[in-house]
From Swiss-Prot:
Full protein name: Bone morphogenetic protein 7
Transmembrane segments: none
Record's subcellular location: Secreted
Keywords: Chondrogenesis, Cytokine, Developmental protein, Differentiation, Disulfide bond, Glycoprotein, Growth factor, Osteogenesis, Pharmaceutical, Secreted, Signal
Family: Belongs to the TGF-beta family.
Signal peptide residues on this chain, from the entry's feature table: 1-29
Post-translational modification, as annotated: Several N-termini starting at positions 293, 300, 315 and 316 have been identified by direct sequencing resulting in secretion of different mature forms.
Organ and tissue specificity: Expressed in the kidney and bladder. Lower levels seen in the brain.
Length: 431
């Protein structure tokens, strides 16, 4: 038994680029009219060269110049947990939830949040316009003693220098957790303010710009969300101006309060309550992969042949189409991509893999209605039947493609959730 090589059906099908390489789990399947797939998988271990080729191709499609090697701080920190909530929301939105059709099995999370979702309805709204979400870990945090009237501040810094080119910030949030306070400030009201640091000075306070503030009771607990969209855009365009954020807590009469005493959790708190930043991005330009030529030389050679007997060739074509009826018609077949088998489980959080599928089969005259043939393909089939040396048969290609979302760490241990379009074949047809 051997693994069949897959044929490139159309230039927009990414599967064609991986056809010689997908040997780890490919299968031929009968695809019935009710979209039920029956398959018998063929397994064999990848050789080192094959693994490297696959890794290089998939990284290129994911838009990554190299394999990320993060200094992992744990998948159960607050930032990865928040991003997992967004990942699950995006999967449900695009049909990847239980019973959904958008993402094919197995498309599931590696771990669960096992608690109330961190993401809000507003975050889900931001997902609608975004094609990439990044969370950023706090690089520096320490309390500073300033001159009157501000005595207590907490500083946060985030590295936005690794943002891919062509991505624009559509929304950005700073998130910090506030615990319930049982003593001292029982009935007190706090004003929590977040500032952008414009310029730092020796011996006096930094120049600050107020970004957002919230007023709340000392007894309140939960995640506090501050809008920092404006400064995030500025930092992406001018990274040298990124001097971080400052946070202050005051009573309504202006008394400065230590953020820790107000219940705000810093980097030394529990993993699932540490502060972080999240930004939503949308691509301002589309990048296309170059399409490799496959078989154009052979096709031109076939077209250059002039038959001596046109009628004999036409009769041979009739026989060819008769035998095509006995061969498999254009259908969807199973093809599973396993990130775990590629050894990427240390930086890809979710999914472990996904069912990509591919299209293969005959597009012979006459085309049946279930082949999802275009009008052009119908005409092309007829012309090929009459004059096969002039026009080739239509190709079996995807007619519907779906996206997948991939959640992963970058080199700086930031968590990225990115949507990749046209990655899963939903339906096949003749083109």
């Amino acid at each position: 038994m051997h693994v069949r090589s897959l044929r490139a059906a159309a230039p927009h099908s990414f599967v064609a680029l991986w056809a010689p390489l997908f040997l780890l789990r490919s299968a031929l399947a009968d695809f019935s009219l009710d979209n039920e797939v029956h398959s018998s998988f063929i397994h064999r271990r990848l050789r080192s060269q094959e693994r490297r080729e696959m890794q290089r191709e998939i990284l290129s499609i994911l838009g990554l110049p190299h394999r990320p090697r993060p200094h992992l701080q744990g998948k159960h920190n607050s930032a990865p947990m928040f991003m997992l909530d967004l990942y699950n929301a995006m999967a449900v939105e695009e049909g990847g939830g239980p019973g959904g059709q958008g993402f094919s099995y197995p498309y599931k999370a590696v771990f669960s949040t096992q608690g109330p979702p961190l993401a809000s309805l507003q975050d889900s709204h931001f997902l609608t316009d975004a094609d990439m979400v990044m969370s950023f870990v706090n690089l520096v945090e320490h309390d500073k003693e300033f001159f009157h009237p501000r005595y207590h501040h907490r500083e946060f810094r985030f590295d936005l220098s690794k943002i891919p080119e062509g991505e624009a910030v559509t929304a950005a949030e700073f998130r910090i957790y506030k615990d319930y306070i049982r003593e001292r400030f029982d009935n007190e009201t706090f004003r929590i303010s977040v500032y952008q640091v414009l310029q730092e000075h020796l011996g006096r306070e930094s120049d600050l710009f107020l970004l957002d503030s919230r007023t709340l009771w000392a007894s309140e607990e939960g995640w506090l969300v501050f809008d920092i969209t404006a400064t995030s855009n500025h930092w992406v365009v001018n990274p040298r101006h990124n001097l971080g954020l400052q946070l202050s807590v005051e009573t309504l009469d202006g008394q400065s309060i230590n953020p820790k005493l107000a219940g705000l959790i810093g980097r030394h708190g529990p993993q699932n309550k540490q502060p972080f930043m999240v930004a939503f991005f949308k691509a301002t330009e589309v990048h296309f992969r170059s399409i490799r030529s496959t078989g154009s030389k052979q096709r031109s050679q076939n077209r250059s042949k002039t038959p001596k007997n046109q009628e004999a060739l036409r009769m041979a074509n009739v026989a060819e189409n008769s035998s095509s009826d006995q061969r498999q018609a254009c259908k969807k077949h199973e093809l599973y991509v396993s990130f775990r088998d590629l050894g990427w489980q240390d930086w890809i959080i979710a999914p472990e893999g996904y069912a990509a599928y591919y299209c293969e089969g005959e597009c012979a005259f006459p085309l049946n209605s279930y082949m999802n043939a275009t009008n052009h393909a119908i005409v092309q089939t007829l012309v090929h039947f009459i004059n096969p040396e002039t026009v080739p048969k239509p190709c079996c290609a995807p007619t519907q493609l779906n996206a997948i979302s991939v959640l992963y760490f970058d080199d700086s241990s930031n968590v990225i959730l990115k949507k990749y379009r046209n990655m899963v074949v939903r339906a096949c047809g003749c083109h």
